[in-house]
């Protein structure tokens, strides 16, 4: 609890702010969350006006516990075409929680013709190969972004880039709207066939 409070105070000092809109606990294990003392600290910070909303960033069982606890108003979690555990098993349990999807383009594994051993995209590359999907006439980035941004329960997504042109293309792709139902059905069939037991990447 002390480190959480210090993190809040440091953030306030660094941003020269009186209040942090959303403060996230990152990747906190379920057994720690179950004690409840970290949430108590966040509740006190909300009551004191130091933060607006207490959030949790994580995946799998700890995320499910955080959502079910009812003590967080926002979550940040992995959601993409190759990482659907959180989407299928957690999102939508509590409609009042704000959801930020991280890794919305799955670390762009389509950049690699062969397995990118040791690269952060390696797991998602393996999963895309197993899913045997094609981009349905779109660029992979468009398919991935539209899948994530318009997924049920997702309110926004974080995608990083160092190039302004890539940012503009990402915005344009998201603005194309949800994927066609036929495309979503094929993705769903592929996931159910080989990916149903895949946990979220942490």
Feature-to-residue mapping (PLM):
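Structural motif corresponding to the early beta-alpha repeats
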Residues: 1-2, 26
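Short, well-ordered amphipathic alpha-helical segments that serve as non-catalytic structural scaffolds
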Residues: 2-12
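Active-site groove signature of glycoside hydrolases
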Residues: 12-32
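Beta/alpha (TIM)-barrel catalytic core signal, keyed to glycine-rich beta->alpha loops juxtaposed to Asp/Glu
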Residues: 26-202
């Amino acid at each position: 609890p002390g480190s959480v409070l210090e993190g809040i105070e440091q953030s306030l000092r660094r941003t020269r702010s009186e209040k942090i809109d959303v403060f996230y606990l990152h990747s906190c294990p379920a057994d720690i969350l179950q004690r409840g003392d970290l949430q108590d600290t966040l509740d006190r910070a909300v009551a004191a006006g130091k933060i607006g909303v207490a959030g949790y960033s994580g995946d799998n069982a700890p995320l499910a516990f955080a959502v079910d606890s009812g003590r967080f108003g926002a979550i940040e979690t992995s959601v993409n075409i190759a990482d659907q555990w959180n989407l299928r098993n957690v999102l939508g349990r509590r409609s009042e929680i704000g959801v930020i999807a991280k890794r919305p383009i799955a670390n762009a594994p389509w950049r690699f013709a062969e397995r990118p051993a040791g690269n952060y995209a390696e797991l998602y590359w393996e999963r895309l190969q197993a899913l045997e999907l094609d981009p349905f006439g779109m660029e992979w980035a468009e398919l991935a972004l539209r899948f994530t941004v318009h997924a049920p329960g997702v309110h926004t997504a974080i995608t990083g880039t160092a190039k302004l042109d890539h940012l503009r293309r990402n915005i344009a792709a998201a603005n194309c709207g949800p994927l066609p139902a036929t495309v979503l059905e094929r993705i769903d069939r592929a996931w159910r066939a080989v990916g149903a037991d895949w946990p979220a990447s942490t």
